Amino acid sequence: MAAASVSAASGSHLSNSFAEPSRSNGSMVRHSSSPYVVYPSDKPFLNSDLRRSPSKPTLAYPESNSRAIFSALKNLQDKIRRLELERIQAEESVKTLSRETIEYKKVLDEQIQERENSKNEESKHNQELTSQLLAAENKCNLLEKQLEYMRNMIKHAEMERTSVLEKQVSLERERQHDQTHVQSQLEKLDLLEQEYNKLTTMQALAEKKMQELEAKLHEEEQERKRMQAKAAELQTGLETNRLIFEDKATPCVPNARRIKKKKSKPPEKKSSRNYFGAQPHYRLCLGDMPFVAGKSTSPSHAVVANVQLVLHLMKQHSKALCNDRVINSIPLAKQVSSRGGKSKKLSVTPPSSNGINEELSEVLQTLQDEFGQMSFDHQQLAKLIQESPTVELKDKLECELEALVGRMEAKANQITKVRKYQAQLEKQKLEKQKKELKATKKTLDEERNSSSRSGITGTTNKKDFMKLRPGEKRRKNLQLLKDMQSIQNSLQSSSLCWDY
């Protein structure tokens, strides 16, 4: 520092000493009247724009040796001063750097310490986490074991429950079977008791009837004996009267004639006996039959006239009132057999189309109900398959589902067949209706043509009405209705008037 002060003092002295001649010289240059221009002190070069500081002026003329030495010394002093300043700055910068390095080391040490502390904390935390994870894994293993044990327990409980339920169901079925068997036995016993009571009552009635019949037979036997006695008396009386009459009337008749008469009498008795047995119909007394005055015996819709017709038929020998054997001349056994055959044929007659349609609709309804039940079972099985915990149960349910799908397909085929058959019946019914309509149209056209040709609508008798076919009456009524509708449509309100 002392050297720096000495150099600074010497530099200031030299600068003062150098400054004085320059001032004197400058004054000389300024005050001298010369033809040359003064060279600018701040431009080292004339052809360039470079400028210099006023502390370092440029001289246009060469300096003297002393001045050059002074300028060199001055420059050296400036350099020394600059170097001193740089050294001082360097020392200060070194000091600041040492301070900064110390501070940086402190900061680094603190950061390293913090990192080590954080690492230690992280390691501790990681150790705690690993210990917690191990404890959690142990707990999970224990819970899994407990869960497996609980599953096994639930399976065993379900198996036991199913076995108990199956036993209960089997016992219930056996009990129901026993109950039904006992009930059937009791019903049979009741039926047997009822039949026994019926038989006892029937037996009592039969015994009563037998007693009544025996009494009647006894009475009839007595009556028959009386009649036989009376007949014998009458026969003897008749014989005596005949003999008396023959003796009186023809005393000279030969014996052969008497024999013939005697032979011819027994068949007459037989014919008189068989007369009532061979009656073909009821013979009524004409005096008991009434007569309605003013009524004809022709067929009519009036009830009184029909009564008169019946009375007329009963008075005459009408085959309508005779026995079937008389009319048909067929034995009774054959007639019964023919009636049985007719009844069988009538019983075998096919059912009507309406009954078939009703039966088909009922069958279709039942099939559709069964198909709906199967679809519901299908949905339930699908839910059970989704919720099934084990693979075995899932396989069993899938097998059941496949079987159910097969049954559903078969049921759908049955439904389609029934619907096809129903559609065929509907088509046949429509075709029949079309044919009937065509036939009715033809008959109506024929009737129109016949009515247009004749122009007279005659009234049909009862015999002609009976000769008509079964559908003719309906067709005629339909045609009459159509004609009335056409007449009503053809009439207008203006054409109608009332005559008073």
Curated annotation (Swiss-Prot):
<feature type="compositionally biased region" description="Polar residues">
    <location>
        <begin position="451"/>
        <end position="460"/>
    </location>
</feature>
<feature type="region of interest" description="centrosome localization domain (CLD)">
    <location>
        <begin position="58"/>
        <end position="239"/>
    </location>
</feature>
<dbReference type="GO" id="GO:0005829">
    <property type="term" value="C:cytosol"/>
</dbReference>
<dbReference type="GO" id="GO:0034451">
    <property type="term" value="C:centriolar satellite"/>
</dbReference>
<feature type="compositionally biased region" description="Basic and acidic residues">
    <location>
        <begin position="434"/>
        <end position="450"/>
    </location>
</feature>
<dbReference type="GO" id="GO:0005794">
    <property type="term" value="C:Golgi apparatus"/>
</dbReference>
<keyword id="KW-0493">Microtubule</keyword>
<protein>
    <recommendedName>
        <fullName>Centrosomal protein of 57 kDa</fullName>
    </recommendedName>
</protein>
<dbReference type="GO" id="GO:0017134">
    <property type="term" value="F:fibroblast growth factor binding"/>
</dbReference>
<keyword id="KW-0963">Cytoplasm</keyword>
<dbReference type="GO" id="GO:0043015">
    <property type="term" value="F:gamma-tubulin binding"/>
</dbReference>
<keyword id="KW-0175">Coiled coil</keyword>
<dbReference type="GO" id="GO:0008017">
    <property type="term" value="F:microtubule binding"/>
</dbReference>
<dbReference type="GO" id="GO:0042803">
    <property type="term" value="F:protein homodimerization activity"/>
</dbReference>
<dbReference type="GO" id="GO:0007286">
    <property type="term" value="P:spermatid development"/>
</dbReference>
<dbReference type="InterPro" id="IPR051756">
    <property type="entry name" value="Centrosomal_MT-associated"/>
</dbReference>
<feature type="compositionally biased region" description="Basic and acidic residues">
    <location>
        <begin position="461"/>
        <end position="471"/>
    </location>
</feature>
<feature type="region of interest" description="Disordered">
    <location>
        <begin position="434"/>
        <end position="472"/>
    </location>
</feature>
<keyword id="KW-0597">Phosphoprotein</keyword>
<comment type="similarity">
    <text>Belongs to the translokin family.</text>
</comment>
<dbReference type="InterPro" id="IPR024957">
    <property type="entry name" value="Cep57_MT-bd_dom"/>
</dbReference>
<dbReference type="GO" id="GO:0005634">
    <property type="term" value="C:nucleus"/>
</dbReference>
<feature type="modified residue" description="Phosphoserine">
    <location>
        <position position="53"/>
    </location>
</feature>
<keyword id="KW-0539">Nucleus</keyword>
<keyword id="KW-0206">Cytoskeleton</keyword>
<feature type="coiled-coil region">
    <location>
        <begin position="63"/>
        <end position="242"/>
    </location>
</feature>
<dbReference type="Pfam" id="PF06657">
    <property type="entry name" value="Cep57_MT_bd"/>
</dbReference>
<feature type="compositionally biased region" description="Polar residues">
    <location>
        <begin position="18"/>
        <end position="34"/>
    </location>
</feature>
<dbReference type="Pfam" id="PF14073">
    <property type="entry name" value="Cep57_CLD"/>
</dbReference>
<comment type="function">
    <text>Centrosomal protein which may be required for microtubule attachment to centrosomes. May act by forming ring-like structures around microtubules. Mediates nuclear translocation and mitogenic activity of the internalized growth factor FGF2, but that of FGF1.</text>
</comment>
<feature type="compositionally biased region" description="Low complexity">
    <location>
        <begin position="1"/>
        <end position="17"/>
    </location>
</feature>
<dbReference type="GO" id="GO:0051260">
    <property type="term" value="P:protein homooligomerization"/>
</dbReference>
<dbReference type="GO" id="GO:0008543">
    <property type="term" value="P:fibroblast growth factor receptor signaling pathway"/>
</dbReference>
<feature type="region of interest" description="Mediates interaction with microtubules">
    <location>
        <begin position="277"/>
        <end position="491"/>
    </location>
</feature>
<dbReference type="GO" id="GO:0005874">
    <property type="term" value="C:microtubule"/>
</dbReference>
<dbReference type="InterPro" id="IPR025913">
    <property type="entry name" value="Cep57_CLD"/>
</dbReference>
<feature type="coiled-coil region">
    <location>
        <begin position="392"/>
        <end position="492"/>
    </location>
</feature>
<dbReference type="GO" id="GO:0005813">
    <property type="term" value="C:centrosome"/>
</dbReference>
<feature type="region of interest" description="Disordered">
    <location>
        <begin position="43"/>
        <end position="62"/>
    </location>
</feature>
<feature type="modified residue" description="Phosphoserine">
    <location>
        <position position="55"/>
    </location>
</feature>
<feature type="region of interest" description="Disordered">
    <location>
        <begin position="1"/>
        <end position="34"/>
    </location>
</feature>
<comment type="subunit">
    <text>Homodimer and homooligomer. Interacts with microtubules. Interacts with FGF2 and RAP80. Does not interact with FGF1 or FGF2 isoform 24 kDa.</text>
</comment>
